[in-house]
């Protein structure tokens, strides 16, 4: 069974980026090579600060969308609670 992840990275400017990946470590490396999202491309390096694992892509994408609606403060609380 495949694993699906929602992750948050902290960018060099202190901002937070939320994304989805099947392989979080490879995705973070991709962000740091400038091959990830446009948002992170100009905010490198990024550091993984949070991740959640799901059994299905659908669950992970729903959670990614939910987290993307959070305020910065709510994301920081989520990171701190883990």
From Swiss-Prot:
Spell out the SMART domains in the cross-references: GIYc
Domain GIY-YIG: where?
2-77
Which superkingdom, per the lineage? Bacteria
Cross-referenced PROSITE patterns: GIY_YIG
Q: Which SUPFAM superfamilies match?
A: GIY-YIG endonuclease
Q: Name one Pfam family in it.
A: GIY-YIG
> Matching CDD domains, A to Z?
GIY-YIG_UPF0213 (cd10456)
Q: Where are the transmembrane segments?
A: none
Q: Which family does it belong to?
A: Belongs to the UPF0213 family.
Q: What is this protein called?
A: UPF0213 protein SAOUHSC_00458
* Organism the protein comes from: Staphylococcus aureus (strain NCTC 8325 / PS 47)
């Amino acid at each position: 069974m495949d694993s699906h992840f929602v992750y948050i990275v902290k960018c060099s400017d202190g901002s937070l980026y939320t994304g989805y990946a099947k392989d979080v470590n490879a995705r973070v490396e991709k962000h740091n090579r400038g091959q990830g999202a446009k948002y992170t491309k100009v905010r490198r390096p990024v550091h993984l600060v949070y991740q959640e694992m799901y059994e299905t892509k659908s669950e992970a994408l729903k959670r990614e969308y939910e987290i993307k609606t959070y305020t910065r403060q709510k994301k920081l609380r989520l990171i701190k609670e883990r």
